[in-house]
Amino acid sequence: MLILISPAKTLDYQSPLTTMRYTLPELLDNSQQLIHEARKLTPPQISTLMRISDKLAGINAARFHDWQPDFTPENARQAILAFKGDVYTGLQAETFSEDDFDFAQQHLRMLSGLYGVLRPLDLMQPYRLEMGIRLENARGKDLYQFWGDIITNKLNEALAAQGDNVVINLASDEYFKSVKPKKLNAEIIKPVFLDEKNGKFKIISFYAKKARGLMSRFIIENRLTKPEQLTGFNSEGYFFDEDSSSNGELVFKRYEQR
């Protein structure tokens, strides 16, 4: 079983590391090509392209400039400990045991605009390059064309290595669009998280993102390997709704706190 999650815009390179072990990203030759393209952009161009403030554009221009192909614990940190968005608030990888990291390294993958696919312990230098950004490159008009089949092929390698054919899609639509389902040697299961608001159940972005992290942690902590085991997920008040689930979608609901 292979879990897919999105990266985060918020990064943490200050907190103490909870594991010293690391691996290197497997698609760095591709990353270097994107960095080459990104370095051509001025801060104002970055601001327009990414729809971010001038200050953030300056920070990211510096990140592109400072990026180098030699990754060490001095200039990079493990991806699962560097990302700090809503998904990662639910995941809480900073509290993982070494055995948890081992299981995650085999069963969890982070999709990335710059790195393509990251394993949890892959070192990562800081960046911001969302998958949906239209960064023109030698392979096309955006990152989807740049990555082509590369991400899908890498996921197929991971599935083959564990002798399995199930993908748990906990990534956002923006990131899962970089995967080609018809070329993926897997059954795709998509958990959906609905929160009650004024008597109606709907996707509330912040809660749904955190729930994706909670589900990832649930799978890792309990060493789950079969999709039917996911229905036992009950973190922070969520429960499985079989009647609402169908066609590879597992629906989980949570009542509003009264």
From Swiss-Prot:
Gene Ontology CC: cytosol
Q: Which Pfam families match?
A: H2O2_YaaD
> What family classification does the UniProt entry report for this protein?
Belongs to the UPF0246 family.
In its UniProt entry, the species of origin is given as Escherichia coli O8 (strain IAI1)
| Protein name according to UniProt | UPF0246 protein YaaA
GO biological process terms held by the UniProt record? response to hydroperoxide
InterPro entries hit by this protein = YaaA
